[in-house]
Regions:
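A conserved glycine-rich beta-strand in the N-terminal activation segment of trypsin-fold
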Residues: 147-222, 398-487
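A common structural junction motif
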Residues: 115-123, 178-182, 388-395, 434-435
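A cross-kingdom marker for long, charged
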Residues: 281-285, 408-409, 415-416, 495-529
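Short, surface-exposed beta-strand/loop micro-motifs that present aromatic residues
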Residues: 74-87, 147-156, 357-361, 404-412, ...
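Helix N-cap motif at beta-to-alpha junctions
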Residues: 100-105, 163-168, 374-378, 419-423, ...
Length: 529
């Protein structure tokens, strides 16, 4: 499918078999637990031998033949970022490429009917127009305010669907050989081999030329700076391109769910500098005793020496950058701790660890809580409160950090930093933990991710529910059968777990969840109105 994708595409995703994804989804634990509760019809998929027969002969209903034969790709051509009132809106220019391996005459009525139904779901009050440009017919569904579009064309066995005509025309030009394609890209081929794309359900790729652009788009979210500063964006993009190479993704079934694997390629010099400091400590993370078991998300940093790792990242990256880019990178790196009221990250990290976690107690929480074991309490009080004797005294005492919208507390050899109401919740949990000896669900998460330098657990209920809701919108299914039972089932879902480690080529991330990235992609196609 890379033969149809523009060589300069920002993001490229592909799937070579729809039905393999469908089979993986219906075999997950979450599917079998929830589909009846959510009113999803049980439509059996053809077996593997029947799929091969349909693919080879083309015998069967046309929709089934298309599903059995189709390969699909998604390309993002531009981010489409616009600034308004100090907020950044991202509206990517993108297209879906569907290679049906079936004649245009056979697929056209089926494809047009499917697109009509999709437009009716995706755009309320959509109107249809057709026009021809250079012997190519474009089918366009537009929202009443013309703010949204679905544009499609059929060229032989290839169907191209985009969110504007330019995206569709760009991909059409690639198919006709008028623009270079992505197929021969060396980084793409290397990423395919590394992530074993041929054995995966789906594969994704961002070239080194474009990874910096994506980093620069996300930087304002980390630093808290106003979006739209072109000079800042260019500095971030230029700096990122000197340390970050291509980015890849693959997906496959695993342990009753879906595992997503990501690779962020780093320069060999940076990998060798970081390797000695990215060793995961094996100690039990006692700081989890102050975290509620129903927490929305928690990230555990298990480095043997957090300060040494911080320094290694700073110096390792700085050696690859010019002076100005180094200053910008350092400010971005520090921003992660500045949000907790920590103005001096170096001295802070000298006084805490090796156990460090960040946690969001509730989904709606705007800020996280940072919790760490204390190495030098007097020095830490100096960092936080400006004097070694300052700050909260005694157990379960909370005190605001001067000049910051955050607070701190010391309990059982740990420091807690974050919004005051969240700290009081954690302190209450610490008191309960002293009376209980049960194995917490979070302890199981830490045990199962012991080899990773960074591990994150996130409640998966929202993504599972959104996936099924999107599926219901797509199929026109009924309402959930039992809301109370559904709520209980959602509460019992296992955490989505992400493990991050430093591998041979760069940063590797593995995420085990109910439906993987497919749980996020389907709601994008069938959003809530």
């Amino acid at each position: 499918m890379a033969a149809y994708a523009p060589s300069d595409a920002l993001v490229y995703l592909e799937c070579n078999n729809f039905l393999d994804i469908g089979e993986a989804i219906v075999n997950t634990t979450a599917w079998n637990e929830f589909r009846h509760l959510l009113g999803i019809n049980d439509r059996s998929l053809p077996g593997s031998w029947l799929r091969r027969l349909i693919t080879w002969t083309g015998l069967g209903p046309t929709p089934t033949v298309i599903l059995a034969r189709a390969q699909v790709a998604v390309v993002v051509l531009e981010l489409g970022a616009t600034e308004k009132d100090e907020s950044l809106t991202i509206k990517p220019e993108a297209a879906i490429l569907l290679e049906t391996h079936t004649s245009e005459r056979r697929i056209r009525p089926v494809v047009e009917d499917a697109l009509r139904r999709f437009a009716a779901i995706a755009i309320q009050g959509a109107t249809l127009q057709r026009h021809t440009v250079s012997d190519t017919e474009f089918i366009v569904w537009s929202a009443p305010d013309h703010n949204r579009q679905i544009v499609a064309t059929i060229s032989g066995s290839l169907v191209i669907v985009g969110n504007n005509e330019r995206a569709v025309q760009t991909c059409l030009d690639v198919q006709r050989g008028l623009r270079p394609n992505l197929q021969g890209h060396q980084e793409l081929q290397q990423m395919r081999a590394t992530l074993k794309a041929e054995e995966s359900l789906a594969f994704g790729f961002v070239s080194s030329a474009n990874s910096g652009r994506l980093i620069s788009a996300a930087a304002p979210l980390v630093t808290g700076t106003a979006p739209g500063d072109l000079r800042f964006d260019r500095l971030i993009a230029a700096g990122a391109s000197k340390v970050l190479g291509s980015v890849g993704w693959s997906s496959g079934p695993a342990n009753g769910g879906i595992e997503d694997r990501y690779l962020f390629v780093l320069t060999p010099n940076l990998v060798s500098r970081l390797r000695p400091f990215f060793k995961a400590g094996q100690q039990r993370t006692s700081v989890l005793d102050v975290v509620p078991d129903d927490v929305h998300s928690v990230t555990v940093y298990k480095f043997e020496d957090p300060f040494a790792t911080w320094q290694a990242v700073q110096t390792g990256v700085s050696t690859q950058l010019d002076t100005l880019s180094t200053i910008v990178f350092t400010s971005v790196l520090k921003a992660g701790l500045n949000s907790y009221g920590i103005e001096d990250p170096n001295n802070f990290l000298r006084t805490v660890g090796p156990e460090l976690i960040t946690t969001r107690l509730r989904r709606e929480s705007e800020r996280s809580v940072l919790i760490g074991s204390v190495r030098d309490e007097a020095a830490l009080r100096q960092v936080l409160f400006g004097q070694s004797t300052g700050g909260p005294k005694g157990p379960a005492v909370v005190m605001g950090i001067p000049g910051e919208e955050t607070a701190a507390s010391f309990v059982n050899g740990n420091v807690l930093i974050g919004p005051e109401p969240d700290l009081r919740t954690c302190l209450s949990e610490a008191q309960n933990a002293a009376l209980q000896s049960d194995l917490k669900r979070l302890d199981e998460f830490v045990r199962d991710s012991s080899s990773a330098g960074v591990a994150t657990a996130t409640q998966d209920d929202d993504r599972v529910l959104n996936f099924f809701e999107a599926l219901r919108r797509m199929n026109g299914s009924g309402t959930p059968a039992d809301a109370e039972q559904l709520s209980r089932k959602l509460d019992s879902l296992p955490y989505s777990v992400t493990q991050t480690s430093l591998g041979e080529h760069g940063l590797e991330r593995r995420t085990q969840s109910s439906f993987g990235q497919f749980g996020s992609l389907l709601p994008l196609l069938f959003p809530t109105r």
